[in-house]
Amino acid sequence: MAMGNPELRTHFFRSSHEPGIPNSLRFPNGFLVTCGLPWLLLLFSVTIILFHPLRKKSDLPLINPGKGRIGILRGYRSRKTFTTELPRLVADGLSKASAFRIAAPDGVNIVLAPSYAHEIAEHPDLNPGPIAGDEFNSHINGFEVFAQLGTSDVISESVRTRLTRQLTKLTPLLTSETPLLLQSQWKDAPDWVEVSPHETALFILSRLSSLVFVGDDLGRNPDWIRILTSYNTEAFAAAEELNLWPQILRPLIARLKPSCRQLRRYIRDARALLVPVLEQRRHAQSQGDRREYNDAIEWLDETSRSTGQPYDPILSQMLLAIGSFHTSSDLLGQVLLDLCMRPDWKVLVRELRKEIISSLQGEGWDKIALNNLKLMDSVLKESQRLKPASTVTMGRYASREITLSDGTIIPKGSTVFIANVAMRDSNIYPDPDDFVPDRFTTRREKGDSSAYLVSASPEHLGFGLGRHACPGRFFAANELKIVLSHMLMKYDIKLPDNGAVAPSKSGIFLATNPDARICVRRRKEEIVI
């Protein structure tokens, strides 16, 4: 369950009322919809033109100021370039300064070079909580799942402590479920079949994570899986569309857009499925049932009671799904493509199979076996290095004005990111654009403690850095190794004739291309795993 870099926080039953239209703007007999809406949009637009141009908040250079004299048009063009051209903007910015500004949908953000990563990660006045809320408009109904970020520590503490402590107990569940899920997707055909690595990864990992998060009954419910995977995918797209509008108009636009209305339905449907499970467990406990549940429903509740912090069980589960489904499936899908794109892919897959067989010859799937998958660990980390989840990372909100060690000033209220470029730095990684499967295995042999998949360092920010690094990365690493082992032992893989497909880019996100395909063929595995 790779949580990406957003640290999972939550709040109990946060009010999710839609922002209402002030009484002064209400019209009788449906006038607002039929006649008043165009004038209301015009009024808001004029307000923005007059009072909301892109303003300087610091002396740092602004890379995408936009063109034109009208503030609203200039702001739209800046937001558009952020969405479509962020990698180029970051490269342009770093060629001019180690600290610069970029106009984004949620305002003008500060981007810093990787050399600032440690300082930003440990600064007490830089908090990741508000970032996702702004980016995903968490104050708007339908996006309130993201409001769980930054309001309490219930989710992050549940993942960091309770989930991590249960890794050994969860391994049998993952290893027994994975072959069933994989067979349902790739079948047993002896001939080559074309499949989507993205869809396969999402299908398997969403179901494995759901079993861990909500238990056996609801975790196997196809409606629950559909709701969470659909919300996971569509919330990002809806937020991107909404962010092209000025902030002042977004609550109104969200009321009208079908995609935003659909998000609200997903939340209602998820609540309708999970609430009966919660009530059933509470009723059973009140009747003396002492059954112990090893899932996130219980971990969240235990953490809330031990810390005294409230949370919303439904929104918390949806946020866990976003953190788990999205980043883990993206990495697994990309690894499959990277393996197939290697000129010597047959040799590499053969070496990985040898390592799997050797690792499982002892006690089977245990902690030692997972730790012995060193080449696989390196392959996963190398794939994440070449195609991280985002162009910028470690988003932080400045709660007061901050002066960094080199004199750079971060104004109060600023959003700060680290440019995710160190992983392509030739001074750190020789041949940085090449996929080198054993790159991190070699580093581990030389005593580099940062060369493990789960290690976070300024040179590899795949899981963030410092106290806000992804708390679920240890579970994610185990889950990915188990699933990839079953894939490689049970199937041959290769690229189709039309070859590789580049990752897709949108805003800060870099994703495995959903149109990419690989070919798979059932093989006879050397050992039963």
Swiss-Prot record:
Regarding the membrane, this protein is recorded as: Single-pass membrane protein
EC no. given is 1.-.-.-
Residue ranges of coiled coil: none
InterPro entries cross-referenced by the UniProt entry: Cyt_P450, Cyt_P450_CS, Cyt_P450_E_grp-IV, Cyt_P450_sf
User: In terms of one coarse class, where is the protein primarily found?
Assistant: membrane
User: Which CDD domains does the entry mention?
Assistant: CYP503A1-like
Tell me the GO BP annotations in alphabetical order: austinol biosynthetic process; dehydroaustinol biosynthetic process; terpenoid biosynthetic process
**One Pfam family cited in the UniProt record for this chain:** p450
Query: Where are the membrane-spanning stretches?
Result: 31-51
Give disulfide pairs as residue numbers.
none
Q: Does the keyword Lipoprotein apply?
A: no
| Compartment(s) where it occurs, according to its Swiss-Prot or TrEMBL record | Membrane
Any one annotated GO CC term: membrane
| Cofactor names | heme
Supply one GO molecular-function term. Answer: iron ion binding
Provide the phenotype resulting from gene inactivation.
Impairs the synthesis of austinol and dehydroaustinol and accumulates the intermediate compound austinolide.
Role, per record: Cytochrome P450 monooxygenase; part of the gene cluster B that mediates the biosynthesis of austinol and dehydroaustinol, two fungal meroterpenoids. The first step of the pathway is the synthesis of 3,5-dimethylorsellinic acid by the polyketide synthase ausA. 3,5-dimethylorsellinic acid is then prenylated by the polyprenyl transferase ausN. Further epoxidation by the FAD-dependent monooxygenase ausM and cyclization by the probable terpene cyclase ausL lead to the formation of protoaustinoid A.
Query: What remark does the entry add?
Result: In A.calidoustus, the austinoid gene cluster lies on a contiguous DNA region, while clusters from E.nidulans and P.brasilianum are split in their respective genomes. Genetic rearrangements provoked variability among the clusters and E.nidulans produces the least number of austionoid derivatives with the end products austinol and dehydroaustinol, while P.brasilianum can produce until acetoxydehydroaustin, and A.calidoustus produces the highest number of identified derivatives.
Family membership, please give it. Answer: Belongs to the cytochrome P450 family.
Name the chain's protein. Answer: Cytochrome P450 monooxygenase ausG
